[in-house]
A protein has these predicted regions:
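Short, hydrophobic alpha-helical packing/hinge segments within bilobed ligand-binding/sensory domains
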Residues: 42-43, 61
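Conserved functional loop/turn residues at catalytic and ligand-binding sites
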Residues: 35, 49-50, 67, 92, ...
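Hinge/capping helix and adjacent helix->loop/strand transition within the periplasmic-binding protein
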Residues: 1-37, 41, 88, 93, ...
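Residue-level detector of flexible, active-site-proximal loop/helix-junction positions
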Residues: 14, 38-40, 75-77, 141, ...
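Short loop/turn segments at beta->alpha junctions
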Residues: 35-38, 57, 145
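An extracytoplasmic/periplasmic, membrane-proximal ligand-sensing/linker region
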Residues: 26-29, 111-174
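A ligand-binding cleft/hinge motif common to bilobed small-molecule-binding domains
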Residues: 17, 22-26, 48, 53-83
């Protein structure tokens, strides 16, 4: 029954939506996409039975306890923060996808200011209390310095451009 199962995302072009677009492509599944304006409205819609499934981050779902059931996470293996949740990979779908978060500054920022910011961010990422707070929010950290993060973003951009050419997501919303 292609297109009969409805899934929600936190909006067109968001990380949650793109992960579901990849899921559809990798599995040959056709789902009916309903975009929402964020995690709160999407959670309410799932709990209210208005959509059957949703693409969301662990941090948006895990605090709900037993009200929502996480079926899979888009990682190579199980998260240490949610070890009972199987990965797509272990269920036969090689879907590995993460949400990127970072700090940026204007290109004209002086080198000494960039250096101080990088040092401060490195210290924050290494701080055990900060790491504990991130874990409490079900957010796994993968700290990368500027050049490494830029390289990851450039690779992701190329992958998204390819995805866009084969599956434009504006056409994917019904």
């Amino acid at each position: 029954h292609p297109g009969e199962l409805t899934y929600g995302s936190t909006g067109i072009g968001t990380d949650d939506h793109l992960a579901m677009v990849l899921f559809e492509r990798m599995t040959g599944t056709k789902l009916n996409h309903v975009p929402f304006t964020g995690a709160g409205p999407l959670r309410s819609s799932v709990l209210g039975g208005h959509v059957e499934v949703a693409g969301m981050n662990l941090g948006e779902v895990m605090p709900m306890g037993n009200k929502m059931r996480v079926l899979a996470q888009a990682s190579a293996g199980r998260s240490k923060l949610a070890p009972d949740v199987p990965s797509f990979t272990e269920q036969g779908v090689n879907l590995v996808f993460s949400s990127e978060r970072g700090i940026v500054a204007p290109a004209a920022t002086p080198a000494d200011v960039q250096r101080r910011l990088a040092e401060a961010l490195r210290a924050i990422a290494a701080d055990p209390e900060f790491q504990k707070q991130m874990a409490q929010q079900f957010t796994e950290m993968d700290y990368l310095e500027g050049a490494a993060w830029k390289a990851r973003l450039e690779k992701a951009t190329a992958e998204f451009n390819t995805l866009w050419k084969t599956t434009p997501w504006s056409d994917n919303a019904k």
